[in-house]
């Protein structure tokens, strides 16, 4: 402990001085115990010997100071560690402030000896020449430690180093914060205002000061101008600066230059650098401005379009038929090669006055193109749409036709009493009614006109009033043109027309009822008289063929009855009743038309037949058709024989089989007769009237399930598989076939399939079993030798 205190006192006295050895390590004196031991030895051996050994030890210590220093450092490591922990922080700071130059000078002095030593003044002069900080003169320099008083080296403490670094960082952060606060202190915040803004006097003073500064500046400028004019400097300056202004290249020099890009490539507010396009030295072309980035972008877009591999054949492509000047330009046949032959035609525009471009000309050209496109004739038609069940108001306006209403003046006629004899019998006359559906759409609203032979109506007596006699009276049925200036004629209401029709029908019904009552009473009287006469004469009523209500049994009636059982094809949709005719009118028309016209629709049951007409029809059919067809000659070939068999019914085709399955009760073959279906008009109008459009389903086709099977055959008539059919169609479309190897392979495969079909169930495709049997028959053996010969099998064996 005493030694440590002694060393600490020596360090405090030394201050910041230190001595460096030749090996770079400080010398440390030995401990006191070792020193005392050597001293005791030297005292015991003698004075001269001890001094000699002491001197030699000192010289050795000077030579091997490095080695001894390392040993001393190792010996005092533990002691130095304890001492470093007890040192105060102030001494550490002093140690850091030691001058490096002084230590270097001291070390060099110690290592080189007294001969190469410099004084502090000389060292300071030398350091001043080198630009270094001079050494402190007042510092107390202490010589290197001796053996008795060694100098200990400082121990490196990592904790102290870390604390030192943290302290430096804190100091640097505080300094930076101080500088930042100083900089921000000069900036005014939003809440701070200048004092002269609120104070009126300060504001006036500041404005006066600014005005004075302006006046002084103007005076100085005038003074300088006067001095320049006196010495002639102003003219020289103007000439120099004017020449420089003329030499400068400005935007007005860009007028007329061509920019080889589309005007849409430039966006408003975007800065883009344009450079002159590279061209040959001998090319006498105008300068063109381009942008390198836009050129690369256009090239990349073009490469992308080329990679898409669009089809070249576009027969219906609508190209621009006009050029930029709205002139018709010729169309090239192979326009896809124009770019390769003539070169690419880039988009370009010219700069206007001031080096600007607004794209007005391009917009005008686009408007012209749009107008020309609108003038073109369009061949596109309106797409199909569902027919509506009702007419729209617009269609109703076009459908209705206004008629002029004719003013009708009715004359007062004398009342004429109508008797039953005046009415003509309506049952005996024929009516041209519409009993079919061929005129369904056209004559629906037309009431069947009955031609009645009316007695001439007596003309009324001439009136005494000349105005009425000379008046031109027009009727609704007359189609004369109305006089000019007459009011516009309006169409009568449909409801009123319908009411008039119903009233007319009611009137006719009452007349018919009265007439029927009169007829019934007359017929009853006639029947009673005839019955009395027949009883007297003794013959029956049934023999009178013209008597009404009688049934005639003969061959013709039976034939007509049989024909009535055959269904009429094509009249399935003709069961619609006419709306305009009432029930009594239908009965009347059926009785008036007779059986000749009603056979087409109602052939079931009994009906009356006119014998004369039936004979004429039979004669016509007999004369027009032949009973026996001409038979084809068989010896002409196989086709004639097949035709003969088909006509006689010996050969049944697939169509006849299907027909027989569908209609098993059909007695007559389909080849003998045919049914003419002329009901296309009926179907047309019936569908339109019944459903009013094509939105309804086909009810008659509900159970129909089509069975479509498409088959293809080759040249030999063999059915092709889907793959083979596709290959055949593809070859026919492209105009080329398979190669030789594929064709041979396919033919070989077909031959094998043919052999498989021809082979027997008990044999192979090549007939090896049959060949084996033939071989066995020829050799008369139950076996066959596959290799070798039969002689080897029957050879005599060699015996010993």
UniProtKB/Swiss-Prot annotation:
Cross-link (Glycyl lysine isopeptide (Lys-Gly) (interchain with G-Cter in SUMO2)), chain numbering: 125, 133, 141, 147, 188, 277, 329, 336, 400, 414, 548, 648, 657, 684, 699, 709, 723, 749, 758, 775, 780, 791
Keywords (A to Z) from UniProt: Allergen, Coiled coil, Isopeptide bond, mRNA processing, mRNA splicing, Nucleus, Phosphoprotein, Spliceosome, Ubl conjugation
Compartment(s): Nucleus
Compositional bias of kind Basic residues: 32-42
Coiled-coil features, chain-numbered ranges: 157-231, 490-533
Tissue expression pattern: Ubiquitously expressed.
PTM section of the record: Sumoylated with SUMO2.
Biased composition (Basic and acidic residues): 58-101
Cross-referenced InterPro entries: HIND (IPR045347), SNU66/SART1 (IPR005011)
GO terms assigned for molecular function: RNA binding
Modified residues (Phosphothreonine): 189, 392, 430, 695, 764
Pfam families, per the entry: HIND, SART-1
Modified residues (Phosphoserine): 321, 348, 448, 474, 486, 521, 591, 596, 598, 621, 761, 789
One term under GO cellular component: nucleus
Region annotation (Disordered) ranges: 1-120, 311-330, 419-497, 571-604
Glycyl lysine isopeptide (Lys-Gly) (interchain with G-Cter in SUMO1) cross-link, chain position(s): 141
GO biological processes: maturation of 5S rRNA; mRNA cis splicing, via spliceosome; mRNA splicing, via spliceosome; positive regulation of cytotoxic T cell differentiation; spliceosomal snRNP assembly
Biased composition (Low complexity): 104-119
Family to which this protein belongs: Belongs to the SNU66/SART1 family.
Function: Plays a role in mRNA splicing as a component of the U4/U6-U5 tri-snRNP, one of the building blocks of the spliceosome. May also bind to DNA.
Quaternary structure, from the entry: Identified in the spliceosome C complex. Component of the U4/U6-U5 tri-snRNP complex composed of the U4, U6 and U5 snRNAs and at least PRPF3, PRPF4, PRPF6, PRPF8, PRPF31, SNRNP200, TXNL4A, SNRNP40, DDX23, CD2BP2, PPIH, SNU13, EFTUD2, SART1 and USP39. Interacts with UBL5. Interacts with IVNS1ABP (via Kelch repeats).
Protein name in the entry: U4/U6.U5 tri-snRNP-associated protein 1
Organism: Homo sapiens (Human)
Gene: SART1
């Amino acid at each position: 402990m005493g030694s440590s205190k002694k060393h600490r006192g020596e360090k405090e006295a030394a201050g910041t001085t230190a001595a460096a050895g030749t090996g770079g390590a400080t010398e440390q004196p030995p401990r006191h115990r070792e020193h005392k031991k050597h001293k005791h030895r030297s005292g015991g051996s003698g004075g001269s010997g001890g001094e000699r050994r002491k001197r030699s030890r000192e010289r050795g210590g000077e030579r091997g100071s490095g080695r001894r220093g390392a040993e001393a450092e190792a010996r005092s490591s533990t002691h130095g560690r304890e001492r470093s922990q007890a040192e105060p922080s102030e001494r550490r700071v002093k140690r850091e402030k030691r001058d490096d130059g002084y230590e270097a000078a001291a070390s060099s002095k110690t290592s080189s000896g007294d001969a190469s030593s410099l004084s502090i003044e000389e060292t300071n002069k030398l350091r001043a020449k080198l630009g270094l900080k001079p050494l402190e003169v007042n510092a107390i320099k202490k010589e290197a430690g001796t053996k008795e008083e060694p100098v200990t080296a400082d121990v490196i403490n990592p904790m102290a180093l870390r604390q030192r670094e943290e302290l430096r960082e804190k100091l640097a952060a505080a300094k930076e914060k101080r500088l930042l606060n100083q900089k921000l202190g000069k900036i005014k915040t939003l809440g701070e205002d200048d004092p002269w803004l609120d104070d009126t006097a300060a504001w006036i003073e500041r404005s006066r000061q600014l005005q004075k500064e302006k006046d002084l500046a103007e005076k100085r400028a005038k003074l300088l101008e006067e001095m320049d004019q006196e010495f002639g400097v102003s003219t020289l300056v103007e000439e120099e600066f004017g020449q420089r202004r003329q030499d400068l290249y400005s935007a007005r020099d860009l007028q007329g230059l061509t920019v080889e890009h589309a005007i849409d490539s430039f966006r408003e507010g975007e800065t883009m650098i344009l450079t002159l396009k590279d061209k040959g030295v001998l090319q006498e072309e105008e300068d063109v401005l381009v942008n390198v980035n836009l050129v690369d972008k256009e090239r990349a877009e073009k490469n992308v379009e080329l990679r898409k591999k669009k089809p070249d054949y576009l027969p219906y492509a609508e190209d621009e038929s006009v050029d930029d000047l709205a002139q018709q330009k010729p169309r090239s046949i192979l326009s896809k090669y124009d770019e390769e032959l003539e070169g690419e035609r880039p988009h370009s525009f010219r700069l206007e006055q001031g080096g600007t471009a607004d794209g007005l000309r391009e917009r005008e050209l686009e408007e012209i193109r749009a107008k020309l496109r609108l003038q073109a004739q369009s061949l596109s038609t309106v797409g199909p749409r569902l027919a509506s069940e009702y007419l729209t108001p617009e269609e109703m306006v076009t459908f209705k036709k206004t008629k002029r209403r004719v003013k009708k003046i009715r004359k007062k006629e004398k009342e004429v009493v109508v008797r039953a004899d005046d009415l003509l019998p309506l049952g005996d006359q024929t009516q041209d009614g519409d009993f079919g559906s061929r005129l369904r759409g056209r004559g629906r609203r037309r009431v069947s006109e009955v031609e009645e032979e009316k007695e001439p109506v007596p003309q009324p007596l001439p009136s005494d009033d000349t105005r009425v006699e000379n008046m031109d009276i027009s009727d609704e049925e007359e189609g004369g043109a109305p006089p000019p200036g007459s009011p516009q004629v309006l169409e009568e209401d449909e409801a009123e027309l319908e009411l008039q029709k119903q009233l007319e029908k009611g009137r006719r019904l009452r007349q018919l009822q009265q007439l029927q009552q009169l007829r019934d009473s007359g017929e009853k009287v006639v029947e009673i008289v005839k019955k009395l006469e027949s009883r007297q004469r003794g013959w029956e009523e049934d023999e009178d063929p013209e008597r009404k209500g009688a049934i005639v049994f003969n061959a013709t009636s039976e034939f007509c009855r049989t024909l009535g059982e055959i269904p009429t094809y094509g009249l399935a949709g003709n069961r619609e009743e006419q709306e305009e005719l009432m029930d009594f009118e239908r009965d009347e028309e059926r009785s008036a038309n007779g059986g000749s016209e009603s056979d087409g629709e109602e052939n079931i049951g009994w009906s009356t037949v006119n014998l004369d007409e039936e004979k004429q029809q039979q004669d016509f059919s007999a004369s027009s058709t032949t009973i026996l067809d001409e038979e084809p000659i068989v010896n002409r070939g196989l086709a004639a024989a097949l035709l003969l068999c088909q006509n006689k019914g010996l050969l049944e085709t697939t169509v006849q089989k299907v027909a027989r399955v569908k209609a098993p009760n059909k007695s007559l073959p389909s080849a003998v007769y045919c049914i003419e279906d002329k009901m296309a008009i009926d179907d047309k109008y019936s569908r339109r009237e019944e459903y009013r459009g094509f939105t309804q389903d086909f009810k008659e086709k509900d159970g129909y399930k089509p069975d479509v099977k498409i088959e293809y055959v080759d040249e030999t008539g063999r059915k092709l598989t889907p793959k083979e059919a596709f290959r055949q169609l593809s070859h026919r479309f492209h105009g080329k076939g398979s190669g030789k190897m594929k064709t041979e392979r396919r033919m070989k495969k077909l031959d094998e399939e043919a052999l498989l079909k021809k082979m027997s169930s008990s044999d192979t495709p090549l007939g090896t079993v049959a060949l084996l049997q033939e071989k066995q028959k020829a050799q008369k053996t139950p076996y066959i030798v596959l290799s070798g010969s039969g002689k080897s099998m029957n050879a005599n064996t060699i015996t010993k």
